[in-house]
Amino acid sequence: MAELDFNIQATVRTDKGKGASRRLRHEDKVPAILYGGQGEPIALALDHNKVNNMADYEAFYSHIVTLEFDGKKHQAILKDMQRHPYKPKLTHLDFQRVEKGHKLHTNLPLHFLNETTAKGVKEEGGVVVHHVNDVEITVLPKDLPEYLEVDIAELSVGDTIHLTDLKLPKGVELVELTKGEDHDQAVVSITAPRVEKEETEEDTVAPGDVPAENSKDADEE
């Protein structure tokens, strides 16, 4: 897995409200908040362009981020990101503190391997169906992976991979499976391709049409 460094310089903001947030955006800053753990929530201002560039990386949404302000470094994970409805702009970010020795509760993306070469696709003409694209996990910060890999190379048409089939890295626990066996949901499957019914000659006969042989029999009667 690639090692990416998400280090963000921040400043503590004291002005709050819509007006203050609007002024920040005019200065190419984006408002954010850091909360959770043993500390109080802290309102922050971040460099918009830098954060926007980081948002292009999938790992930004599941990786530990370092926020630097007031001469200290604070580790956190991104919990929410709000975007402008039609402009390529971020409008707000929520970060949750990461504390050493305390488990994180976050979502992890799934990477599906061998989708085009899977047995059920290449040999049987099946179609891959993704039932989920990420999973909810708990994990210690030191064991947090960037994503989970799901290899479907051996799947045939009709086969399904469930949560219990996933190969989990050390220390990773799936939240859904802690709720009971009935939460072992499907992750990915291969289904048979949809076959459209071919139109037959009988299907094309209009309701009022009568085959010639039947018409002749009727005349003889």
Swiss-Prot record:
Q: Which Gene3D superfamilies does the entry mention?
A: Ribosomal protein L25, beta domain (2.170.120.20), Ribosomal Protein L25, Chain P (2.40.240.10)
Q: Show the segment(s) annotated as Disordered.
A: 192-221
GO: which molecular function terms? 5S rRNA binding; structural constituent of ribosome
An example of a Pfam family matching this protein is Ribosomal_L25p
Show the GO cellular component annotation of the record. cytosolic large ribosomal subunit
The record ties this protein, via PANTHER family, to:
RIBOSOMAL PROTEIN L25/GLN-TRNA SYNTHETASE, ANTI-CODON-BINDING DOMAIN-CONTAINING PROTEIN (PTHR33284), RIBOSOMAL PROTEIN L25_GLN-TRNA SYNTHETASE, ANTI-CODON-BINDING DOMAIN-CONTAINING PROTEIN (PTHR33284:SF1)
Subunit structure of this chain's protein: Part of the 50S ribosomal subunit; part of the 5S rRNA/L5/L18/L25 subcomplex. Contacts the 5S rRNA. Binds to the 5S rRNA independently of L5 and L18.
Q: What is this protein called?
A: Large ribosomal subunit protein bL25
Look up and give the organism this protein is from: Idiomarina loihiensis (strain ATCC BAA-735 / DSM 15497 / L2-TR)
* UniProt lineage: Bacteria, Pseudomonadati, Pseudomonadota, Gammaproteobacteria, Alteromonadales
The gene name reads rplY
